[in-house]
Amino acid sequence: MKRIVTIQDFSCVGSCSLTAAIPVLSAAGVECCGIPTALLSNHTGFPTFYSIDLTDELAPISDQLKREHIDFDGVYTGYIASIDQIEHIEEFIRRFRKPGDPLFIDPVMGDNGKMYAALTDDYPERMRKFIEGADIITPNITEACLLTGRSFNPCPTLHETKEMLRELCGFGVKFAVITGFSEKGQLGA
């Protein structure tokens, strides 16, 4: 059985992050190992939330997994609570990702045209560097705009979407999928 490590927050409310990733990957027949970046009362899309930052726990967890000779067949990241955490996760990837293992990055940082309040203004620039070398990234339309420096447009044309995808892949990404936008007159995400 393949073993994937997913590194992202645990949101008590919000059907996202580790609470969504673990059962979905498990149902696909993959052993899913979760490493939490933060414990959140509810996800950061709510007006307010309570958060326990787990940055200081990432290195000891990584060290323990290495001592136990635990291997992974891929890495999947979601919400990363700070630039400092990105640096810890890059070190984790250097230690555990083997050549040929997929790196899947969901560059979670905003929704509805706005960056999450908990993140700093320099976060999108740092995320651009983090996604270099990823096999797949899945930004939503807000995150795609933040990564490419474009103004938010909730309903980009097909041409604009293709331009954004080309820009995203220009950051050294193999494949990019933009999620969560609607077409005028259409429902769905």
Give a label for each model feature.
Residues M1-I105, M109-A117:
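Conserved N-terminal subdomain of the carbohydrate kinase-like
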Residues A117-A189:
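Conserved phosphate/ATP/ADP-binding segment of small-molecule kinases
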